[in-house]
Curated annotation (Swiss-Prot):
UniProt-recorded name of the protein: Probable multidrug resistance protein NorM
Primary location class: membrane
Subcellular location: Cell membrane
Pfam families noted in UniProt: MatE
CDD domains found in the cross-reference section: MATE_NorM_like (cd13131)
Family: Belongs to the multi antimicrobial extrusion (MATE) (TC 2.A.66.1) family.
Annotated transmembrane regions: 14-34, 56-76, 97-117, 134-154, 164-184, 196-216, 241-261, 283-303, 320-340, 353-373, 389-409, 415-435
Role, per record: Multidrug efflux pump.
Listed GO biological process terms: monoatomic ion transport
Amino acid sequence: MKPTETLQEKGKLFLVVMMPILITQIGLYAMNFFDTVMSGQAGANDLAGVAIGSSLWVPVFTGLNGVLLALTPIIAQSIGAEKRDDVPYVFLQGLYLSIAISIAVILIGAVVLDPILSAMSLEDEVGRIAKEYLIGLAFGIVPLFIYTTIRCLIDSLGETRVTMFITLLSLPINIFFNYVLIFGKLGFPRLGGVGAGYASAITYWFILAVAIVVVVKVRPFTDFQLFKKLYHVSLKKWKEILLLGLPIGFTIFFETSIFAAVTLLMSTFDTATIAAHQAAVNFASFLYMIPLSIAFTLTIAVGYEVGAKRVEDARQYSRLGITFALIMGLVAGVIIYVLRAPVASLYTNDSQVAWLIQQFLIYSIFFQLSDALATPIQGVLRGHKDVNVPFVMALVSFWIIGLPTGYLLANFSPLGPYGYWIGLITGLASCAIALSWRLKQMQRKFERAARLSQNGNS
């Protein structure tokens, strides 16, 4: 980041920072996208099984990934304070924490997976595929979380294009192993949807290997000599990471887990409905990478201006990012409506499932618009280091308002499964309204603080 004078300069810099982030996010999500699409081509049971497995895994990963994202500002502040010697220490503590988290996830998953699946009203084949898909995926959990730590280091140095390169390099690897393992090509067994789990695990090991080579062999990362000294575990540093990361992680978890909860509650419906719901959520979430990338960029830009106490510049970046997100949300809504039939055909050859996908996609237009407002505002608030109140707002909006509304409509009205989607829309809209109020409050607080600082210096 650098100081800018005009709105045009801000717009150009915003896009320069955002585009590598957007490509990276789309690439990462594309792996889940191709898991779903290619599993759907193997059969409705495979699509439903992967849907259930993903619904259990994605909230866990995104929430814990959010915790580790706290490393980015911690490392960035060390560099900004010219404490470059602290970077290897902070990085290794994050690395140790990521390994501890991944081992805990595997152990807890081994204990609770069977009871969770048994408690769901799943067809036997769907339950088997979901379980074996997650077992396959588990082989890649450790490298995935270690890579997250390395990515935080890379991004904190502003080298977002490196992350983009690694992601784009890994995508064809994921597609290749999906193809050979799901459909049994090149002498591999035909695993169906289960193969998508093993393909993801292989890809995660590949990503980690490339990332390690980059930070060990390529400047500016080599300047830090990250692995020259292996420090002991510091619970004090872990506490610092967790105090900042847990509110971020829980906020992300509450938003992503609401979709997972709806998918799990939909297990009372038939396999076609489960499969169609997951396909629609998958495509809508793919488009969600746009406001998410805008949010990440806003955190960087607004945080930079807040640190420099430039009130109007921070406000301009906020308006710029939120307006851009709303425009892209409208564009995404039009794309979903116009292309809902071709999109449905990407996921399945089953006419009943394809018809249901199209119906769900129409509902997804409305929560796409809510996300276009709520998500960038979250990015702005993180730029202000405001994480605790948005966490509470997310909890109330999604779990106290959204999910109960969806459950009541789905089970006590003629809407059936569509009731859950109305609940999702209600929760997201509530969160967007609450966050808008919080943003105005934080901007007024920042203006007062900056004014007092100027008066004190004059």
